[in-house]
């Protein structure tokens, strides 16, 4: 189904099939390549294809080496010789109710979008890490167990953020969680809730 701004994927894992229609100008060597982009959401598999063009499938939970260490989007470079009306078939599946929003933009524009989003994510990671270091320092200095619950809450929150952004699956130490799929996200959220309750209990 379409929500007005993208394609809504069924939450039971059934593949959604849809077709993208767009038009490209004549190739210009002075400009960067066109690319097909989707914002990064929890899809089990994302496939794009057109006559003579079939890139490797992509997955939120199993990022490839081409995605880099901190991927912020799904992207595929379009053939440089394409111009005029084009059609791409897309197949996507997810165990969660998610919306895919496709974009066809220049490579340079896509990189700028990713840089902005990555800067926000890294800032949030750094903030949580600073709070975790403060909690650990207080725990070691004051020997108060209440700081242990706060440290656990910060650690669980950082893990949840890494999983929600898909960055955990690109880290060798956490890549195994990709096998859990959407359930791994749910389990991580339960950890955040449990540690948050402990903090509320200790500081009440």
Model-assigned labels for residue ranges:
Residues 103-141, 145:
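Cytosolic-side membrane-insertion boundary helix
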Residues 10-12, 123, 187:
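Charge-dense, low-complexity intrinsically disordered segments
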Residues 1-118:
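Soluble non-transmembrane domains of integral membrane proteins
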Residues 129-204:
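Juxtamembrane segments at transmembrane-helix boundaries
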Residues 83-85, 97, 122-126, 151, ...:
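Generic hydrophobic/packing signal
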